[in-house]
Amino acid sequence: MALTVPLIVLAVLLSLMESPASAPVHRGRGGWTLNSAGYLLGPVLHPPSRAEGGGKGKTALGILDLWKAIDGLPYPQSQLASKRSLGETFAKPDSGVTFVGVPDVVPWKRIRPGTTRFQI
């Protein structure tokens, strides 16, 4: 009687273990892939293994459907052509702060102690 309990526990534990055939196959990270410029290209697609059987035509049609769905998505703004001229691209930006009757200077360089930079 004392020997049967450990044998039953051992049998249950062995049945719960994964065999190499039932273990999931990890084929890399998966997910989405980027090109060298950092633009999103699409999902990483792995060809089916020979163990999964035929169905080569079904897989190809599935990949085509996936790419058609992805092509229907809107592109991010960074891929659209910029309408700025070369001069606008390299132009020096404004300070962004203008006061009436006050020359355009860097406001924080003329701050007196005890005042904030937005006081006039």
Curated annotation (Swiss-Prot):
Residues 85-120 form a propeptide. It is found in: Secreted. Keywords: Cleavage on pair of basic residues, Hormone, Neuropeptide, Secreted, Signal. GO terms for biological process: behavioral response to starvation; neuropeptide signaling pathway. One of its GO terms (molecular function) is hormone activity. GO terms for cellular component: extracellular region. Residues 1-22 form the signal peptide. Belongs to the galanin family. Hypothalamic neuropeptide which binds to the G-protein-coupled galanin receptors (GALR1, GALR2 and GALR3). Involved in a large number of putative physiological functions in CNS homeostatic processes, including the regulation of gonadotropin-releasing hormone secretion. This is Galanin-like peptide. It comes from Sus scrofa (Pig).
